[in-house]
């Protein structure tokens, strides 16, 4: 609902009362979800330009040069609230929406990533949400033929009642064939293509801009869209064929705020008149407000010259898609909606699209770190607890549901990053962040998320091209939450600037709180990162290899997996030095290592258990610190001979080989058999399969 202040501001600006269609348009387009009214000043601090950035923030997706003849379109979106109310359809339509964002740039979607965040799996409701979100993503992605090649899973009590479903899509397009979402000239027509419009998703943008109520599953169900991936597949091929004609002048996906959002934003540099009665409908008796604001899926809006309308219609019909010539671009900077000859909305377009007042929220720093308390449990018990935590455990139950090889470009998807072959180079992809660390130290945690994703790319020898983000936070009306948000954006921007990685697009999702579970999510500025390098697969260390750690280990247990399973507390990791990322990237590029992985969740123990489960380690100092600390900017590397690391600061920790994972330190040892490791790492799969 529009606030009383906003409604009064609009009455004064227009000099009259608003129609119901106008109120609905402003309610959605002035919502947090569409207008970024709480975050615009912060977002302007991010570095958005770079030598390969062809089109940065402001369109449906960003365009980044990959080679002289190939560019990537990349975007990232959230579908958080819908995925709680209806996890299957909420997640599925989240995939569909970001795919259409990339498609609207004239790009063929080639890959998806899905960083996901849930409450702990000891609660049946969270298991239900987890299962159906993954099913929704898998079914939609598989049906449209776009591989899900990378993801992230985080389980924390703060996400109970408000899971986060973030999706990254990447597409490819020739640099000279890029479409944009801004109309080109008055007199051109706006043609709606795709599914018929129904009442599903009504008010979705407004719904995404408030807390989840206790009865959200029932009361907010009409705000959740229902997807049809088979229509989406036809729409992909139809839009690409239309773009190939050179007659599509601009294009936009119908997402948040439906036709009202797409057409007003598209025509914001001129004006538009929309004939709502011409829209092809799925349900009888729909009124103009419903037609304009419904968020029915699988719909696109294209601008074409009047003489080319029939050409677009013929292509749509070839793919058995419905289409309607529903509007025109006008020179007058107004947004006009008619229905059966009656004007039902007539407002200044710049007021609707760019006139949202900026919110200025108070902020309050906080201190959340607690003193470290050493756990009483034996090291082996702690090791098995950490390995069985779902953040660390094997993710096979998830990725086995995804078709990762469709389109035949996927080279590798396991371990640190996904690799796709584009022409003769590799597109390397990573995603995610660590909400527990960011909660304790918002600035440092967000900055370290940049380093973590760049580290994943470095393990495959790739250099970052760009970042996209989803800024997921609780309600900014709480001063401590707005401080989290501010510090996270500043940390992200400063590290991206330092590493010269432009932030080219993204999404803001606020009000992630649950009345039902009485939770506020931990701050989650989830990232997607794309990089470029030589084509290579991740390789496991070989027997006899020397294992070494590059990068210094600190006493950083706060927000760690060890902290999650024991409540030990402690300090979160400090700001890491990004210089080590370049060192490791060069090592990989020069072929001096036989295997490499970065150290992140679960520390050295988790890394070694996954990449070299049969190894002999000798640790100096405190084994708790060596095994479980989660200091950023560290890598586990394998080399045939330590001489390969000459001139690089490192610490040898062991060798690959043997019958088990054996760890020795002064005064103690730990042996984990292959059976024990497999049982611990399979904990999530066992839970979800039986």
Where are the regions a protein language model picked out?
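Glycine-/charge-enriched secondary-structure boundary and capping motifs
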Residues: 6, 14-23, 161-163, 248, ...
């Amino acid at each position: 609902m529009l606030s009383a202040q906003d409604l009064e501001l609009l009455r004064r600006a227009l000099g009259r009362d608003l129609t119901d269609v106008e109120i609905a348009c402003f309610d959605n387009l002035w919502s947090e979800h569409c207008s970024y009214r709480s975050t615009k000043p912060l977002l302007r601090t991010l570095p958005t330009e770079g030598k390969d950035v062809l089109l940065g923030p402001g369109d449906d997706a960003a365009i980044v040069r990959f080679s002289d003849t190939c560019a990537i379109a990349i975007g990232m979106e959230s579908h958080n609230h819908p995925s709680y109310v209806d996890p299957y359809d909420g997640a599925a339509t989240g995939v569909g929406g970001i795919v259409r964002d990339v498609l609207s740039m004239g790009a063929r979607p080639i890959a998806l990533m899905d960083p996901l965040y849930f409450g702990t799996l000891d609660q049946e409701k969270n298991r239900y949400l987890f299962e159906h979100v993954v099913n929704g993503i898998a079914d939609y992605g598989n049906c449209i033929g776009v591989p899900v090649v990378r993801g992230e899973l985080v389980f924390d009590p703060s996400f109970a009642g408000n899971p986060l479903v973030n999706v990254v899509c990447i597409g490819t397009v020739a640099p000279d064939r890029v479409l944009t979402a801004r109309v080109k000239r008055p007199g051109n027509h706006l043609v709606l293509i795709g599914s018929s419009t129904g009442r599903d998703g009504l008010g979705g943008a407004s719904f995404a801009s408030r807390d989840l109520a206790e009865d959200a599953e029932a009361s907010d169900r009409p705000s959740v869209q229902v997807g049809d991936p088979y229509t989406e597949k036809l729409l992909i091929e139809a839009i690409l064929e239309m773009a190939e004609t050179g007659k599509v002048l601009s294009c936009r996906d119908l997402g948040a705020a439906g036709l009202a959002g797409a057409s007003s934003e598209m025509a914001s540099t001129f004006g538009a008149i929309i004939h709502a009665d011409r829209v092809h409908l799925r349900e009888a008796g729909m009124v103009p407000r419903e037609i304009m604001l419904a968020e029915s899926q699988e719909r696109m809006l294209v601008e074409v010259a009047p003489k080319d309308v029939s050409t677009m219609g013929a292509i749509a019909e070839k793919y058995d898609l419905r289409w309607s010539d529903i509007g025109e671009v006008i020179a007058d900077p107004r947004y006009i909606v008619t229905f059966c000859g009656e004007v039902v909305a007539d407002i200044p377009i710049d007021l609707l699209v760019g006139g949202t007042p900026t919110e200025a929220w108070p902020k309050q720093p906080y201190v959340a770190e607690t003193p470290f308390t050493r756990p009483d449990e034996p090291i082996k018990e702690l090791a098995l607890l950490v390995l069985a935590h779902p953040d660390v455990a094997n993710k096979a139950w998830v990725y086995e549901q995804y078709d990762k090889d469709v389109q035949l470009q996927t080279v590798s998807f396991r371990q640190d990053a996904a690799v796709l072959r584009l022409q003769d180079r590799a597109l390397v992809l990573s995603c995610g962040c660590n909400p527990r660390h960011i909660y304790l130290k918002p600035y440092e945690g967000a900055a370290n998320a940049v380093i973590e994703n760049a580290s994943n790319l470095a393990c495959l020898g790739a250099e970052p091209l760009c970042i996209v983000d989803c800024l997921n936070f609780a309600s900014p009306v709480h001063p401590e939450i707005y401080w989290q948000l501010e510090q996270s954006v500043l940390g992200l921007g400063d590290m991206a600037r330092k590493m010269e990685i432009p932030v080219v697009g993204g999404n803001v999702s606020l009000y992630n709180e649950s009345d039902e579970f009485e939770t506020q999510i931990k701050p989650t500025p989830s990232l997607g990162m794309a990089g470029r390098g030589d084509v290579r697969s991740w390789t496991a260390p070989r027997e006899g290899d020397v294992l070494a750690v590059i990068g210094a280990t600190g006493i950083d247990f706060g927000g760690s997996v060890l902290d999650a399973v024991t409540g030990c507390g402690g300090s979160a990791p400090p700001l890491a030095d990004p210089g080590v990322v370049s060192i490791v990237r060069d090592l990989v590029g020069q072929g001096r290592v036989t295997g490499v992985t970065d150290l992140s969740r679960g520390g050295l123990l988790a890394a070694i258990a996954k990449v070299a489960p049969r190894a002999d380690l000798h640790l100096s100092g405190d084994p708790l610190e060596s095994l479980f600390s989660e200091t950023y900017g560290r890598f586990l590397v394998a080399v045939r001979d330590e001489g390969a690391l000459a001139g690089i600061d490192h610490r040898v920790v062991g060798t690959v080989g043997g019958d088990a994972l054996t760890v020795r330190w002064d005064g103690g040892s730990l042996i984990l058999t292959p059976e024990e490791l497999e049982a611990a790492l399979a904990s999530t799969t066992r839970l979800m399969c039986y």
